[in-house]
Amino acid sequence: MTRRYWNINLEEMMEAGVHFGHGTRKWNPKMEPYISAKRKGIHITNLTRTARFLSEACDLVFDAGSRGKQFLIVGTKNKAADSVAWAAIRARCHYVNKKWLGGMLTNWSTTETRLHKFRDLRMEQKTGRLNRLPKRDAAMLKRQLSRLQTYLGGIKYMTGLPDIVIIIDQHEEYTALRECITLGIPTICLIDTNCDPDLADISIPANDDAISSIRLILNKLVFAICEGRSSYIRNP
């Protein structure tokens, strides 16, 4: 895999608060190689390591994007949800930003059935057929459509398992990460100082609580995906 330059700037990361970890009492000893200092009771992440692994992740997604691979971005906590949706839409990726439904990947046949139902209901609403049903039936189906939109709206065009999954916050999305590990799907995971760096294929040590930090990491990955996709379009 060719290494590229992704304009990953340490000063920019500091301004975004990427280096701020969790309190020193809430840490995983496996994160010690990625921590540079303790300050006012919190761990400080070594941004040189962050830059290295973020660059590796950008190389990976560029390469995958240039070969037409499919991505899924997962981040369901409030601080990540909007950034995840924005990044995924910008890079034409699938995403989950509300709630991870257990078995979403490992029980793909059930997810596929739900997606078919979701698409059918969307079509019925679009054509006006829902409004021609008895009020009680229409109301029930509209509630069902609303729930499906909330939980599956970001994967409505997904027709199979993703090739790479990008995860924001290992603790919050542990179920999603375990499903990827079970299925052998490569993962890129943003990890804070309380996480296990050994679980993902590429772990990016960074603040997973600050919106500015999450957005910066996603910006770099999305740019690399878009660059890869444009390369794929030029050289199919």
UniProtKB/Swiss-Prot annotation:
Coiled coil: none annotated. Disulfide bonds: none annotated. Gene3D superfamilies: Glucose-6-phosphate isomerase like protein, domain 1 (3.40.50.10490), Helix hairpin bin (1.10.287.610). Keywords: Chloroplast, Plastid, Ribonucleoprotein, Ribosomal protein. GO terms for biological process: translation. It comes from the Eukaryota. It is found in: Plastid, Chloroplast. It holds the Pfam family Ribosomal_S2. One of its GO terms (cellular component) is chloroplast. Its main location: plastid. InterPro entries: Ribosomal_uS2, Ribosomal_uS2_bac/mit/plastid, Ribosomal_uS2_CS, Ribosomal_uS2_flav_dom_sf. SUPFAM superfamilies: Ribosomal protein S2. Signal peptide: none annotated. GO terms for molecular function: structural constituent of ribosome. NCBIfam families: rpsB_bact. Belongs to the universal ribosomal protein uS2 family. This is Small ribosomal subunit protein uS2c. The lineage of its organism: Eukaryota, Viridiplantae, Streptophyta, Embryophyta, Tracheophyta.
